């Protein structure tokens, strides 16, 4: 083992006042003792730092000269001069008190020149306008950093809800219509962070346009199952039904389920899989989607447990690497769920209509070969149209046509397919989706009866919708002309 030695001062140049006893070799040289005699024992203890009095703030008695304290007098209290000023000593209890946050009030606020304090904006209630006998929302400030996609509040989201300041009398009036007693439509805050993000008005159409461009990339092949030798559509349906149960067991977001199916189809479009490894591929796909979409995704051990230990952690992690390599790490894509959420926000969609739309859209995940040829935007638009028709509403509106960029005639083929899928859902062996949407959370939309629709029925609906649109177009110019003339003469 290598060793080193400190240079020895053999000539005693550093400390000439200290003598080294005769016969003592390799003795370490101590530091010079300040304030001692000329000769001291070489083995005497080194001086402590108390002899170096560098504190210039110590109160000194008047008329005396402060000198260095003798090292030998070790019983002298260094803080003896502070005894007269006990009022400056902070009590022990005060040291552990928490600090307080400065808050503006009328005593500390400074009003700008020409303005009174009463005209300043209240920082706590800047979005509430108090009137005589009423409280209504004004200019709700939207959160610009959405972090969650579910109704559970995100750890980084700020709760700015002001529903608590609304009087119960205001809520009871116009509950369904959202109209205040004064006749003004209330601007209720969004329900979660995703919808709060989409409420940014100036970006709404740009976001939709970006979704439409992104959905065309990284599409799975519609007929990939024909090249699979060991698996079939029935096996795929059973796997997706199991993924629905897993997502409900761990309360994963619906977007996680859509992404899992999307990754599965893209992987199977390029790789041939044996039936014994199909569940492993689905498990790894959901594991990737959960890590991509969820805030707190389940651990890999949870997925291994759900497979009844059919696979090991190493196998799941290895399959995760294979899937990511085959997909080239291109994981971001808009699904039908994203479009449905966007339409729900822009059109102020009722909850029952939204859940019915989601139920119809999720049923389409079970049939890969039928619906993989359609874009998610088209699938979501057709699901909205069929859900409105089932609930007895008008199938299509000008607002939906403007947002989705699809006319009612463009949805004919997909709507007819979805109508057949919704009708035969009760006869399927895979019932996880029906059990999911039979709950009170989803308004039990799966219990509603399906409707019969043929091509002729759909053509009649399209004709009626187009006739109504023409009538509205004939009436609209007269109203606009009258309004423009009035505005022109006012100026």
Curated annotation (Swiss-Prot):
Q: Which CDD domains match?
A: CYCLIN_CCNA_rpt1
Tree of life domain = Eukaryota
Q: Which InterPro entries match?
A: Cyclin, Cyclin-like_dom, Cyclin-like_sf, Cyclin_C-dom, Cyclin_N, Cyclins_cyclin-box
- Its Gene Ontology biological processes? asymmetric neuroblast division; G1/S transition of mitotic cell cycle; mitotic cell cycle; mitotic sister chromatid segregation; positive regulation of stem cell differentiation; regulation of exit from mitosis; regulation of mitotic cell cycle, embryonic; regulation of mitotic nuclear division
According to the UniProt entry, the coiled-coil residues are none
**Alphabetized GO MF terms:** cyclin-dependent protein serine/threonine kinase regulator activity
PTM annotation: Ubiquitinated. Ubiquitination state is negatively regulated by a deubiquitinase complex made up of bam and otu.
Q: Return the annotated region ranges for Disordered.
A: 1-21
Task: Report keywords, A-Z.
Answer: Cell cycle, Cell division, Cyclin, Mitosis, Ubl conjugation
What SUPFAM superfamilies does the entry give? Cyclin-like (SSF47954)
Q: Where is the Cyclin N-terminal domain?
A: 206-332
* GO CC term, one of those recorded: male germ cell nucleus
The phenotype of cells or organisms lacking this gene is: RNAi-mediated knockdown has no effect on germline stem cell replication or differentiation.
The entry describes its oligomerization and partners as: Component of the Frs-CycA-Cdk1 complex composed of CycA, Cdk1 and Z600. Interacts (via C-terminus) with Z600. Interacts with otu and (via C-terminus) with bam; the interaction stabilizes CycA by negatively regulating its ubiquitination.
Family membership, please give it: Belongs to the cyclin family. Cyclin AB subfamily.
What is the protein's known function? Essential for the control of the cell cycle at the G2/M (mitosis) transition. Interacts with the Cdk1 and Cdk2 protein kinases to form MPF. G2/M cyclins accumulate steadily during G2 and are abruptly destroyed at mitosis.
Q: Specify the protein name.
A: G2/mitotic-specific cyclin-A
Write the gene name.
Answer: CycA
């Amino acid at each position: 083992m290598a060793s080193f030695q400190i240079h020895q001062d053999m000539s005693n140049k550093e400390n000439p006042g200290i003598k080294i006893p005769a016969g003592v070799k390799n003795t370490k040289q101590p530091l010079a003792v300040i304030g001692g005699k000329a000769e001291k024992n070489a083995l005497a203890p080194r001086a402590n730092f108390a002899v170096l009095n560098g504190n210039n703030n110590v109160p000194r008695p008047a008329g005396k000269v402060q000198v260095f304290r003798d090292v030998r007098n070790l019983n002298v209290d260094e803080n003896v001069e502070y005894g007269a000023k006990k009022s400056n000593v902070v009590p022990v209890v005060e040291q552990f008190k928490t600090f307080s946050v400065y808050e503006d009030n009328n005593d500390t606020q400074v009003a700008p020149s020409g303005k009174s304090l009463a005209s300043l904006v209240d920082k706590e209630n800047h979005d509430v306008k108090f009137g005589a006998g009423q409280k209504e929302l004004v200019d709700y400030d939207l959160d610009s950093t959405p972090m969650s996609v579910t109704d559970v509040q995100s750890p980084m989201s700020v709760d700015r809800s002001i529903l608590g300041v609304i009087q119960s009398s205001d809520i009871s009036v116009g509950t369904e219509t959202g109209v205040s007693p004064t006749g003004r439509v209330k601007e209720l805050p969004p329900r979660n962070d995703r919808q709060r993000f989409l409420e940014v008005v100036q970006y709404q159409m740009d976001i939709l346009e970006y979704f439409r461009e992104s959905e065309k990339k990284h599409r799975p092949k519609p007929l990939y199952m024909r090249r699979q030798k060991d698996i079939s559509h029935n096996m795929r349906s059973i796997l997706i039904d199991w993924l629905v149960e897993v997502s409900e067991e761990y309360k994963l977001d619906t977007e996680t389920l859509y992404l899992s199916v999307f990754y599965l189809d893209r992987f199977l479009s390029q790789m041939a899989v044996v039936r014994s490894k199909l569940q492993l591929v689905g498990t790894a796909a959901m594991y990737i989607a959960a890590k991509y979409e969820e805030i707190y995704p389940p651990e890999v051990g949870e997925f291994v447990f759900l497979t009844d230990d059919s696979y090991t952690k190493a196998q799941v992690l290895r399959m995760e690497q294979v899937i990511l390599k085959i997909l080239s790490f291109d994981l971001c894509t808009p699904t039908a769920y994203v479009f449905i959420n966007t339409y729900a926000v822009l059109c102020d969609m009722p909850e029952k209509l939204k859940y019915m739309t989601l139920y119809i859209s999720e049923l389409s995940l079970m049939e890969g070969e039928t619906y993989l040829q359609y874009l998610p935007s088209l699938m979501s638009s057709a699901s909205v149209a069929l859900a409105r028709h089932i609930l007895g509403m008008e199938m299509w509106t000008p607002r939906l046509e403007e947002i989705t960029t699809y006319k009612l005639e463009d949805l004919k083929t997909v709507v007819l397919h979805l109508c057949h899928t919704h009708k035969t859902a009760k006869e399927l062996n895979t019932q996880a989706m029906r059990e999911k949407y039979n709950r009170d959370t989803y308004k039990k939309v799966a219990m509603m009866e399906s409707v019969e629709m043929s091509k002729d029925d759909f053509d009649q609906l399209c004709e009626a919708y187009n006739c109504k649109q023409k009538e509205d177009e004939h009436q609209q110019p007269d109203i606009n002309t009258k309004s423009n003339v009035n505005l022109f003469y006012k100026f």
